[in-house]
């Protein structure tokens, strides 16, 4: 996956 794409998923989970 794109780094940004993975970060977005992590951010949503963290939030």
Curated annotation (Swiss-Prot):
It comes from Cavia porcellus. This is Major urinary protein. Keywords: Allergen, Pheromone-binding, Secreted, Transport. GO terms for cellular component: extracellular region. Signal peptide: none annotated. One of its GO terms (molecular function) is IgE binding. It is found in: Secreted. It comes from the Eukaryota. Belongs to the calycin superfamily. Lipocalin family. Binds pheromones that are released from drying urine of males. These pheromones affect the sexual behavior of females.
């Amino acid at each position: 996956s794109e780094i940004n794409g993975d970060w977005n998923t992590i951010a949503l989970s963290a939030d």
